[in-house]
């Protein structure tokens, strides 16, 4: 029979939470206190995974023990990860991946630039898909992807007059950096872009299509989608812009990428070339400084130069600047849509649509 002490121990034993429980301030202080370097990297793989929730929980325990921070999506169709890890644990992390046949010999794309502050927490989620594409995967062969090209091959193919270079990223990514003469669909999401591509490339089915994205994952699905719709010569940049930057540096190749590479972490961008090709959304001055609007009810991502940052206090509009100076409780009321005062600042006004910021642009633009 168990004694009272044993019963008390069982009563007070709590299951360890398999998610972050700390706020941004605490997480930031922890990261600042680290006295070792971190390595930022990304990887993905389309592979059938079983018992996804159980796998997610095991990965969380194992990767948290290695000090991994980042954003990882797992789904029945595979894994998509952007993360940072203490550099001294990198080999252990590779061993962890190789211990599972589904993740063995994973191509890890190391960040071009790294300030060791790319992520604050470990965020590992189960999703229906590792990239939101809005497609019915049963309707076409998702494994029939385009031909993978090295940086050298991609450069050479760009010289072919029959080639069409297509950026498979969102407009806010391509705005600060893209390949020479690339077609830049003005889409807000990958789901939108896939539909736009068919319209944009209509009648070009016999051309050589050269696709690229940040790390390669979006090209996997987009290339299969185009091949399903009759495109005969579909190619994609192996490892995306990240691998391209490393290869041209290692081999001394000419870079045909202009500007910076947008990344989905705290860094927001990596320098590929020194050229600034984008402009401040507010004054039109040359700038590639991406920030989120300082108004918590907006938080829209946009480009703002230093002068406009000071003028608008980090906000995207005068309206957001006005909201920023309201009492905190009033701001909360506005965000919840409960305030009857200052009706101009409704949620739709606080969070302007991208299409409004870009209302003077055409649906499709070429670099």
UniProtKB/Swiss-Prot annotation:
Keywords: Oxidoreductase, tRNA processing
Domain of life per record: Bacteria
CDD domains: RHOD_YceA
Active site per UniProt: 213 (cysteine persulfide intermediate)
Catalytic reactions on record: uridine(34) in tRNA + AH2 + O2 = 5-hydroxyuridine(34) in tRNA + A + H2O
Record keyword Secreted present: no
InterPro entries: Rhodanese-like_dom, Rhodanese-like_dom_sf, Rhodanese_C, TrhO, TRHO_N
Enzyme Commission identifier(s): 1.14.-.-
Any Pfam family: Rhodanese
Domain Rhodanese positions: 159-249
Signal listed as a keyword: no
Listed GO MF terms: oxidoreductase activity, acting on paired donors, with incorporation or reduction of molecular oxygen
Cysteines engaged in disulfide bonds, as pairs: none
GO biological process, any: tRNA modification
Similarity annotation: Belongs to the TrhO family.
Role summary: Catalyzes oxygen-dependent 5-hydroxyuridine (ho5U) modification at position 34 in tRNAs.
UniProt-recorded name of the protein: tRNA uridine(34) hydroxylase
């Amino acid at each position: 029979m168990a004694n009272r002490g044993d019963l008390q121990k069982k009563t007070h034993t709590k299951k360890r939470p398999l998610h972050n429980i700390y706020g941004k301030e605490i997480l930031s202080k922890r990261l600042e206190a680290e006295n070792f370097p971190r390595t930022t990297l990304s990887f993905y793989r389309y592979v059938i995974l079983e018992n996804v929730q159980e796998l997610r929980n095991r990965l969380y325990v194992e990767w948290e023990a290695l000090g991994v921070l980042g954003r990882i999506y797992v789904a029945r169709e595979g894994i998509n990860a952007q993360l940072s890890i203490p550099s001294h644990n990198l080999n252990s992390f590779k061993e962890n991946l190789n211990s599972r046949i589904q993740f063995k010999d994973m191509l890890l794309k190391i960040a071009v630039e790294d300030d060791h502050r790319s992520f604050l927490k470990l965020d590992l989620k189960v999703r229906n898909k590792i990239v939101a594409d809005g497609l019915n995967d049963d309707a076409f062969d998702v494994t029939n992807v385009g031909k993978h090209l090295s940086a050298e091959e991609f450069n050479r193919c760009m010289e072919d007059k029959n080639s069409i270079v297509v950026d498979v990223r969102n407009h806010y990514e391509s705005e600060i950096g893209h390949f020479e003469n690339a077609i830049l669909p003005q889409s807000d999401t990958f789901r939108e872009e896939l539909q736009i591509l068919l319209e944009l490339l209509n009648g070009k089915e016999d051309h050589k299509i050269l696709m690229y994205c940040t790390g390669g994952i979006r090209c996997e699905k987009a290339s299969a989608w185009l091949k399903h719709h009759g495109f005969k010569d579909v190619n994609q940049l192996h490892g995306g812009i990240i691998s391209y930057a490393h290869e041209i540096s290692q081999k001394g190749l000419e870079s045909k990428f202009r500007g910076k590479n947008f990344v989905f972490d705290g860094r927001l961008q990596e320098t590929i070339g020194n050229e600034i090709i984008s402009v401040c959304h507010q004054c039109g001055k040359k700038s590639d400084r991406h920030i989120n609007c300082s108004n918590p009810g907006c938080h829209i991502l946009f480009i703002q130069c230093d002068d406009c940052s000071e003028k608008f206090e980090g906000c995207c509009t005068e309206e957001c600047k006005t909201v920023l100076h309201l009492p905190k409780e009033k701001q909360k009321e506005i965000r919840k849509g409960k305030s009857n005062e200052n009706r101009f600042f409704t949620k739709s006004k606080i969070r302007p649509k991208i299409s409004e910021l870009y209302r003077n642009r055409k649906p499709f633009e070429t670099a």
